[in-house]
Amino acid sequence: MNKFLTKAIIALGAAEAVRAACTNPSVRKSWSALTDGEKTSYISSTLCLMDAAQAPAKTGYAGSTTVWEELQAAHVSQAQFIHSVGAFLPWHRWYMTVQETLLRNECGYTGPMPYWDEQAEQAEGPLESASILNGSATAGFGSTTLDENGCVTDGPYTNVRLTLDTELNRVEPVCLSRLFKQNQYEQTAQKIIDACLALDNYVDFNNCLGASPHTGGHYAIGGTMDDPSLSPGDPLFFLHHTNLDRIWWQWQAQNESRLTDIGGNNVAEGFFWSSVQPSSLGVNAFLPYFNDNGNTTTLDHVLWMAGIAENITIAEVMDVNSDAICIEYQ
């Protein structure tokens, strides 16, 4: 087993602790509902996490020099075990919470956590009119204007450079890139979400939401977001996945029994997912650690965060009102 993962297993036992009650939930709002000041503050905080002087790496995992790089590395490390699997939604719920905690603790962010309401905005107009695609240096994530290589050329992230590959190696820096696709944006439409929300069990719902609503949001933005492993390098990844989590919570809130409804495989099937998983971190590195005693996802399944946050179980993240998550969607 990978040495770093072994250390994380040991750390899990030490991290078990009594949590404070969820009495002051963090607010999550649509990006379009944030004030200009809140948008500026959020963007500034994400840039802070990318700055080694302000947010140096906590562990240096995979050669990371910043907390932002560590966030990306945590995702790359387990691509085959957090996509097209039972843990897809729980893992990303915890990942969104970890990113929020880092923004607040490392960079002093105090505002609401934003999501991209793709359904509302897709109904209102084409992708190029989306509220997130704004070239403002303080209130957007870059416009649809790109250079010949697809690199972002305006907004606050023009100087972002990414250095990780899917084998967790550090490589020559590349720009934050995009490749916009209107036909993929249409896969996030509310009618598709409604079909998912009508499903009765978690496995079916997870498969539905993890299909075109998930991939459509990624591929609509494209470029860095096209890559299933490296996509957290784009700040828009977190707004997209926070919206997916919001939709999962809408489904859960319909029936209390859904707060314990989990299932699915622990390992994504097929060559595609095995091909993007780092060769040094195969199935045998993760399956024993997940604590499911097999390939079926259970509430006891451990969510691994590569040392940037404690590792907790799916049971602890199933309810957004839980002590571990403690959020309110507006």
Please place each PLM-identified region on the residue numbering.
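Intrinsically disordered, flexible peripheral segments
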Residues: 19-330
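Fungal secretory targeting signals
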Residues: 1-21
